[in-house]
């Protein structure tokens, strides 16, 4: 089973990275650090004559990579009680891909994937991060994806996540449950 960690963090080696690494320890996983790729915001042309136009950025290459994977882990810091703008920008572009003739089976291809979420925040994330988890539930439901689990960790400054033993333990078990892989 191929695994991709789609990381929306913007701090290299930050708390989100640490928790995501813990989750895939012992597995062969591809890490896609979205901040390293130029991705343009969506220009909503769903109802315009001619529809969406091709965009010259790295988005399509990332889509091609994740379509090859069976398990997708969406990792993000919790910024202002939601996912990072970097990750949101990537997911927003799915609206374009759903209508892109180069990806005619995008929704169907995504529907067979197992999805997980890892999120880290500094302001009571195990409560205040729940609306973010619900947002991902809706995203995955719309795409027909199987939402298998999540971990919410607490950390603000670099390295803080190492004190959240509950989150570290949950991350280490995330893919090891009997219904995963």
UniProtKB/Swiss-Prot annotation:
What enzyme category does the UniProt record give? Answer: oxidoreductase
Q: Transmembrane residues, as ranges? A: none
GO molecular function terms noted in the UniProt entry:
oxidoreductase activity
Instruction: Enumerate the UniProt keywords alphabetically.
Output: Flavoprotein, FMN, NAD, NADP, Oxidoreductase
Q: Does this entry carry the keyword Magnesium?
A: no
Q: What is its EC number?
A: 1.-.-.-
Show the InterPro entries listed in the entry.
Flavoprotein-like_sf (IPR029039), FMN_Rdtase-like_dom (IPR005025), ISF_SsuE-like (IPR051796)
Q: Which domain of life is it from?
A: Bacteria
Cofactors named for this entry: FMN
Q: Does the keyword Flavoprotein apply?
A: yes
Described purpose of this protein according to its UniProt entry: Putative NADPH-dependent oxidoreductase.
**Family matches, as PANTHER family:** NAD(P)H-DEPENDENT FMN-CONTAINING OXIDOREDUCTASE YWQN-RELATED
Q: Which family does it belong to?
A: Belongs to the SsuE family.
Protein name (record): Putative NAD(P)H-dependent FMN-containing oxidoreductase YwqN
The gene for this chain is ywqN
């Amino acid at each position: 089973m191929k695994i991709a960690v789609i990381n929306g963090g913007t701090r290299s080696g930050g708390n989100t990275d640490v928790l995501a690494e813990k989750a895939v320890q012992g597995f062969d996983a591809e890490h896609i650090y979205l901040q390293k790729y130029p991705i343009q915001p969506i220009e909503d042309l769903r109802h315009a004559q001619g529809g969406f136009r091709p965009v010259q950025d790295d988005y399509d290459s990332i889509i091609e990579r994740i379509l090859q994977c069976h398990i997708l882990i969406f990792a993000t810091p919790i910024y202002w009680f939601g996912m990072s703008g970097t990750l949101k920008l990537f997911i927003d572009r799915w609206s374009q891909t759903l209508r892109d003739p180069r990806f005619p089976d995008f929704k169907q291809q995504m529907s067979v994937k197992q999805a997980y979420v890892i999120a880290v925040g500094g302001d009571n994330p195990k409560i205040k991060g729940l609306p973010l988890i619900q947002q991902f539930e809706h995203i995955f439901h719309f795409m027909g994806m199987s939402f298998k689990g999540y971990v919410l960790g607490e950390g603000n400054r670099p390295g803080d996540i190492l004190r959240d033993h509950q989150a570290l333990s949950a991350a280490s078990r995330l893919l090891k449950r009997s219904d995963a892989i």
